[in-house]
Amino acid sequence: MKRLVIGICVIGAVVVGVVVRAQGSSTPARDFIPVTDAMLAKPDPGDWLMWRRTLDSWGYSPLDQINTGNVTQLTQVWSHEMGPGRAESTPLVHSGIMFIPNAGDFIQAVDARTGESIWEYKRQLPQGVGPAANRAIAIWGTTIIDASSDNMMYAIDARTGQLAWQTPVFDPKVRASAGSGPLIANGKVFTGRQCLPDGGIDTCVITAHDAKTGKELWRTRTIPKPGEPGDETWGNVPVEQRWHVGTWMVPSYDVETNRVIIGTSVTIPAPKYILGGNDKKHLYHNSTLALDADTGKIVWYYQHLVDHWDLDHPFERLLVDTAVAPDPREVTWINPKLRPGERRKVITGIPGKTGVVYTLDRQTGEFLWARPTVFQNVIQKIDGATGEVIVDPKQTFNAVGDERLVCPGTNGGKNWPAGAYSPQTNTMYYPLQNMCMTAVSNTDQRDPTKVYGLTTKYVMTPGADKVGTVWAISAETGKMVWKYEQRSGMMPLVSTGGGLIFVGDAEGKFLALDEKTGKVLWQTKLPDSISGYPIAYAVDGKEYVAVSTGTSLVGNAAAQMTPEIKTDRKPRMYVFALR
């Protein structure tokens, strides 16, 4: 296939290039249907229009052509080479086109039926700016919208790959990239940021941009300045030393309340004795935030953990309407005011690395219940009446050189590999790791190997020999429905209307589990480690399942626990369908 360079443009200090592969008149790009806000709110069953497919972050496809009865007939139908770097990506599918995000602001458009290339877009980054991982892109109108490694919000034409607009958020060389990409609702592009110390407090923000023009609409900081609400929770820590409350995963959006629901990360340094004292809350780290989508105002917050160990809580929040009847035989912490069986609009799931499931009232942030999954030793108790989380004081640090065995470790437990929710079973499904770490307190936060004030080493959870596990947990009762375990680490998963859970692992296995029992119904072994988010989509009435391989932070860490398992990590998209 001949490669044609059709556009080079210089904007400020950024050079943007587009490489397009020539296509015939039948290319799906010519028949592209613009994506509306209504389509994002209620996607066509065959489409995958955003990170977790829907604004409520379910990670659920209603497609059922591939199901428990015929999944054994699944076979690979095409694959497509991806770009270099961490391949932690989620492909989008619309109008018969698959859009594949790659590390370093490289986006590919391919025919979703065949894998044939349509166009490729590659940003030329300024000197000194490294390529960031790109877990998600967004689609609106006729544009693909993303957050770049050099701190731009930008849009490209979904039909041609040409740049449509771009808007600077910060200086290109400040380490405050988005990490996971945007979510779009009601014409607004919502994006969080990771924010390392060199950027200062003003890079720890959530932003909203106009999807049509790229104009910034608002930005909200996640660390208060003196005189602002929450300032007192930092004690006497000067504002220039308040670092790194990031929002490095994709938010959810509550249509009914017009609120952005997003999670936050740890501070830098993590040990709080270095940061004003172990008794301080340091808002809004490791919290769920509900923001007014029109103004960015924080409506409410709930803090999941005062974090001394880099156990971030930025992961997907599932927005679910369900009866709430936590079973005290399995659910450790329950709000005593809760009336069992009452129907509530909740935020649920595993928001942080601890692997603890939290269920909150979606409108107020009220704590309803919580339970652990994999072994954890950092939370001592949660006050059911107030929702206050009490950490085990024996696990905190008090001086340089203090060493602790911390479970889970910074790899989780839970990490960016997303879980899913199935409305068919009212059950949530989560890929987790049985991993802990030894952690020694240090003080040199400017050293990139010690940036969180910790020197760490991964170890297996005591008594465990299987790294990877998938937990199925009832959204109503909190009971474990089933648990699947295996030697290699688990990667993201997706649930489908066919009663299936598709999940990959660090070894390269791609599995289909029965959503009701956890039984393995089908599996295939790919040449490389699974690294991306699987999706299900349909074109011309035919259902497909896609997943990418390559290198990833979670997969690489899990592999340290299984040195006997050898696998490559070449980035590639694989697509399957029924024979």
Across the structure, where does each feature detected by a protein language model lie?
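Bacterial N-terminal signal peptides
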Residues: 7-17
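Blade/loop signatures of beta-propeller domains
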Residues: 24-76, 222-229, 391-395, 459-460, ...
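Repeat-blade elements of multi-bladed beta-propeller folds
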Residues: 48-52, 84-106, 129-153, 177-206, ...
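Beta-propeller domains
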Residues: 63-73, 102-124, 283, 293-296
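Extracytoplasmic beta-rich repeat domains
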Residues: 80-92, 120-141, 163-181, 221-250, ...
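Hydrophobic or amphipathic alpha-helical targeting/insertion segments
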Residues: 112-114, 135-169, 174-222, 357-368
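Beta-propeller blade signature
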Residues: 156-161, 203-216, 277-296, 359-365, ...
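Blade-level signature of beta-propeller repeat domains, shared across WD40, Kelch, NHL, RCC1
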Residues: 535-579
